[in-house]
Amino acid sequence: MKVYIETMGCAMNSRDSEHLLSELSKLDYKETSDPKAADLILINTCSVREKPERKLFSEIGQFAKIKKPNAKIGVCGCTASHMGADILKKAPSVSFVLGARNVSKISQVIHKEKAVEVAIDYDESAYAFEFFEKKAQIRSLLNISIGCDKKCAYCIVPHTRGKEISIPMDLILKEAEKLASNGTKELMLLGQNVNNYGARFSSEHAKVDFSDLLDKLSEIQGIERIRFTSPHPLHMNDAFLERFAKNPKVCKSIHMPLQSGSSTVLKMMRRGYSKEWFLNRVEKLKALVPEVGISTDIIVGFPNESDKDFEDTMEVLEKVRFDTLYSFIYSPRPFTEAGAWKERVPLEVSSSRLERLQNRHKEILEEKAKLEVGKTHVVLVENRREIDNQIVGFEGRSDTGKFIEVACKEKRNPGELVRVEIVSHSKGRLIATAKGD
């Protein structure tokens, strides 16, 4: 039996897809890259914005046309969680609907016609998924918590993934050890509020926090680097930042989702912090780790966002000079506080703001890239670069999250750590040579 999975959205969905494959492998399903050859087609969905949701029904229609006569189509993930049985009504070709909090039930629903399993109070935190040896992966994803307790006015995730529960540490460490034995060098820890780990478990558990978990994972032989996403700025207190700075295996790059640089808008968003508080955290972090790479999320056009509010966002962009920017126009979502508000920023205004934000960020990246020339970094090799079947170098990321293209005559294998020197840059790209090459 063959299964094809299309994954939309975030890294959490990518990991959920791996867990789906893990469960299906117990039933002798093998993954295929060809939906026409599949006996089961799964669409793992995203609902953070409206666009991926619209895409879902287009995808269902396309798969229904090309699938084998008896092949089943299943819709999984966040859109499945909040639309439930409505998906079956809109798309009769769908055989079942499986919510984001119900991954472990896949082996049950594939045997039921028109099954709907979307309960967000279902607890998978202590579910020991079989280790799925898909292939040796240099960088691997690892869930450490599920759900979200925050009440951000724009976000549907608490409605689709339920309450926040931490996965027991022993299960996390056991899976990390298996990943390391399979060749993983870098872990990416996943959670909706990943740095709030330990706040709540579903059963009795020793008191631990996120920094404790990072320390334990750092002890695993073979694991060279640890990253994590997505943290919440509210949980970046001094103690966390200090331990982040001291742990040599924790990469010195961090995601700090700003959302808006306006304290007024942040209050409307129910983010729990102000512009000044956010900047204070950045200042503290840069004092501890001057070379730190910082990425962020920014929403423009949130209801009632004024010109002054947007200028505040631009001011934070200038002060922090983020290394990576994920920016979007506000998208109203069902089951959210802001989704019910009638006030809307005109699309042409939001589009203009987004363009200005993104263009300035591109300029900042060029300015920062110039300053990198002559500096050295240690890069984890991810891919070899070839021209006409001849190895000309490799690609990888630095400890600070910078993607670097390296010219190198010597063969370097994925997973190796190599010291490189930046020699040039182009449109924000960093180009280097291997030291000693």
Curated annotation (Swiss-Prot):
Keywords: 4Fe-4S, Cytoplasm, Iron, Iron-sulfur, Metal-binding, S-adenosyl-L-methionine, Transferase, tRNA processing. Residues 370-436 form the TRAM domain. It is an enzyme of class 2 (transferase). Residues 134-367 form the Radical SAM core domain. Binds 2 [4Fe-4S] clusters. One cluster is coordinated with 3 cysteines and an exchangeable S-adenosyl-L-methionine. It comes from the Bacteria. [4Fe-4S] cluster 1 binds at C10, C46, C78. It catalyses: N(6)-dimethylallyladenosine(37) in tRNA + (sulfur carrier)-SH + AH2 + 2 S-adenosyl-L-methionine = 2-methylsulfanyl-N(6)-dimethylallyladenosine(37) in tRNA + (sulfur carrier)-H + 5'-deoxyadenosine + L-methionine + A + S-adenosyl-L-homocysteine + 2 H(+). Residues 1-115 form the MTTase N-terminal domain. SUPFAM superfamilies: Radical SAM enzymes (SSF102114). InterPro entries: Elp3/MiaA/NifB-like_rSAM, Methylthiotransferase, Methylthiotransferase_CS, Methylthiotransferase_N, Methylthiotransferase_N_sf, MiaB_methiolase, rSAM, rSAM_horseshoe. Coiled coil: none annotated. Its cofactor is [4Fe-4S] cluster. It is found in: Cytoplasm. CDD domains: Radical_SAM. Pfam families: Radical_SAM, UPF0004. GO terms for molecular function: 4 iron, 4 sulfur cluster binding; metal ion binding; N6-isopentenyladenosine methylthiotransferase activity. GO terms for cellular component: cytosol. Its EC number is 2.8.4.3. [4Fe-4S] cluster 2 binds at C148, C152, C155. Monomer. Catalyzes the methylthiolation of N6-(dimethylallyl)adenosine (i(6)A), leading to the formation of 2-methylthio-N6-(dimethylallyl)adenosine (ms(2)i(6)A) at position 37 in tRNAs that read codons beginning with uridine. Belongs to the methylthiotransferase family. MiaB subfamily. This is tRNA-2-methylthio-N(6)-dimethylallyladenosine synthase. It comes from Helicobacter pylori (strain Shi470).
